[in-house]
Design a protein with these regions (language model features):
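FMN-binding flavodoxin-like domain, especially the glycine-rich phosphate-binding loop
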Residues: 1-22, 29-134
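Alpha-helix N-cap/loop-to-helix boundary motif
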Residues: 20-21, 28, 48, 148, ...
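Residue-level detector of flexible, active-site-proximal loop/helix-junction positions
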Residues: 23-25, 76, 101-107, 211, ...
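A short glycine-/small-residue-rich loop at the edge of a beta-strand within enzyme catalytic domains
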Residues: 24, 47-50, 183, 210
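Generic recognition of flexible, low-complexity loop/linker segments
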Residues: 27-29, 256
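Basic, polyanion-binding surface patches
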Residues: 128-295
Length: 295
């Protein structure tokens, strides 16, 4: 579970140090914690060794008020109760980056997704202030000019095993005739990015002008880690296994062929394998912006 949380954090550009508390030196732990912006801990076994108990104490002693924390059960069958340790962190005035992750059964794909998304939430929490500062420093005339680049409105939906994802997108452009293909820009810290690796399959749902507000509003919500993004939304299953939004104007079934890395996004080139238009006279919804420093 630790690597899944770490992967989610690193998606946001935040660095991660992983430490085995059963063997680390207490002085090293205090130095690492003292320089960190946040700490994530897995629960130790009930019958923890003296060194492990000492090192957990070293973590608590080194924590500072502006740091964030996250806790998860290790599913070893005999973990320490998670709630008492959470209370200790809260009593220190620390902020909880994500809800405690409780693992009652053998970790499933859904649990790993929960861990990944929880890590991403933590990372986004840490870089929020820096992002705001960066946006304020941008050239306003340049951003207004870039904002005149418009695009359609789409919702990407994907499913791999138990794991589902969805994302509202507007940075979409056709990129090839034969085979038919297009590109979509996906922010590195988006949860669905892990479902859009080379060979992965997904659906591009094309929204209709004058009939997109309900779907757009739903998928713009900030979902907590592990939440079902399709609850309350009419869907059917595509031949590639991904959800199709019933109220979309059209849909394309796609397979990721290649990816190009940019500074804060992945440009994902995908080939289209199937598709259908629900309303022949319908027009694609268009998204107009005023500035280019947000979607």
């Amino acid at each position: 579970l630790s690597p899944a949380i770490a992967t989610g954090i690193t998606k946001t550009g935040v660095g991660v140090d992983m430490v085995d508390l059963s063997s680390a030196d207490p002085q090293e732990i205090q130095e690492l914690v003292g320089h960190a912006s946040g700490v994530v801990l897995g629960m130790p076994p009930l019958q923890a060794s003296g060194d492990l108990s000492t090192n957990f104490g070293a973590v608590l002693a080194a924590m500072q008020p502006k740091q964030v924390f996250g806790l998860y059960e290790s599913y070893g069958g005999d973990d320490e109760p998670i709630d008492p340790l959470r209370t200790k962190f809260l009593d220190l005035g620390l902020r909880e980056a994500f809800k405690v992750i409780k693992v009652k059964d053998t970790p499933s794909e859904g649990i790993y997704q929960l861990c990944d998304e929880s890590g991403t939430d933590l990372g986004q929490n840490l870089i929020q202030a820096a992002k705001i500062k960066q946006l304020k420093s941008l050239d306003s005339d340049l951003e207004k000019a870039i904002g005149r680049i418009s695009g359609g409105l789409y919702i990407i939906t994907a499913q791999k095993g138990e794991v589902k994802g969805a994302m509202l997108a507007s940075w979409v452009s056709q990129a090839s005739f034969t085979p038919p293909g297009f590109t979509v820009a996906v922010a590195k810290d988006r949860a669905i990015e892990s479902l859009m690796q080379v060979g992965d399959r997904f659906v591009l749902n094309i929204l209709e002008e004058g009939n997109y507000q309900v779907l757009m509003k739903h998928f713009l919500k900030r979902f907590p880690p592990g939440a079902d993004r399709f609850a309350g939304v009419k869907t059917q299953t595509a031949s590639n296994g991904s959800p199709i939004l019933t109220d979309a104007l059209a849909y394309l079934e796609c397979e990721v062929a290649s990816r190009m890395e940019c500074s804060d996004h992945w440009i994902v080139y995908s080939q289209v394998t199937n598709g259908r238009v629900a309303k022949a006279e319908g027009l694609t919804a268009v998204h107009h912006r005023k500035v280019g420093n947000y979607y």
